[in-house]
Amino acid sequence: MSKAVIVIPARYGSSRLPGKPLLDIVGKPMIQHVYERALQVAGVAEVWVATDDPRVEQAVQAFGGKAIMTRNDHESGTDRLVEVMHKVEADIYINLQGDEPMIRPRDVETLLQGMRDDPALPVATLCHAISAAEAAEPSTVKVVVNTRQDALYFSRSPIPYPRNAEKARYLKHVGIYAYRRDVLQNYSQLPESMPEQAESLEQLRLMNAGINIRTFEVAATGPGVDTPACLEKVRALMAQELAENA
């Protein structure tokens, strides 16, 4: 069986939430919640936190996790993952966002199984259905797919354009990726494309190079932590979840 690892990029610096990976959520740093959920994903050999700050490294080691130091000049999580790829041997690398403490392990398992079911598949990601109102938000990245669930395009604009609104169905892109090793080996050689620069979406670099990205649709996911308001919402939801499971 192909070896799969989960890598959780965790930058300390954040303009809206400084020290974001270490923010407390129901008694644990956020990065610990993500790590513990990643450990629950079946079929994964290792889980690593990739960070650029010793404070995050120390926090991860304090709760018994594995952390790896990376450069602080990476432009994206994928660039950070490429550095990790040179240090951690695997066939499949799953890039799990460090600000998604409510990630469902079964969704990541769906992603991994899709990669294992089709050895020719280079990249995979997740999506879920959303309303037209949510699709109108530029902060929500949308994806249009074909009948095989392969991505045709990602955009911050509402796609497909609702010329016939009754027929439109919107899918939100969930920023979790699975990559084959060879894709990451070649990633740094791929030029930035005009769509990537215009939309500020790194996955468009892969699409511009003709690399297929398959999507797997899941149920609506929990909120990520992007702003102070998001943080308070996640704290409330996870406190409720903790109380229900007590």
UniProtKB/Swiss-Prot annotation:
Coiled-coil blocks: none
Superkingdom, taxonomy of origin: Bacteria
Subcellular location: Cytoplasm
Record pathway: Nucleotide-sugar biosynthesis; CMP-3-deoxy-D-manno-octulosonate biosynthesis; CMP-3-deoxy-D-manno-octulosonate from 3-deoxy-D-manno-octulosonate and CTP: step 1/1; Bacterial outer membrane biogenesis; lipopolysaccharide biosynthesis
GO MF, any single term: 3-deoxy-manno-octulosonate cytidylyltransferase activity
Pfam families in the record: CTP_transf_3
Gene3D superfamilies recorded: Spore Coat Polysaccharide Biosynthesis Protein SpsA, Chain A (3.90.550.10)
Keyword Nucleotidyltransferase: yes
Catalytic reactions of this protein: 3-deoxy-alpha-D-manno-oct-2-ulosonate + CTP = CMP-3-deoxy-beta-D-manno-octulosonate + diphosphate
Keywords on record: Cytoplasm, Lipopolysaccharide biosynthesis, Nucleotidyltransferase, Transferase
Quaternary structure and interacting proteins, as annotated: Homodimer.
Name of the featured protein: 3-deoxy-manno-octulosonate cytidylyltransferase
Organism for this UniProt entry: Escherichia coli
Gene (UniProt): kpsU
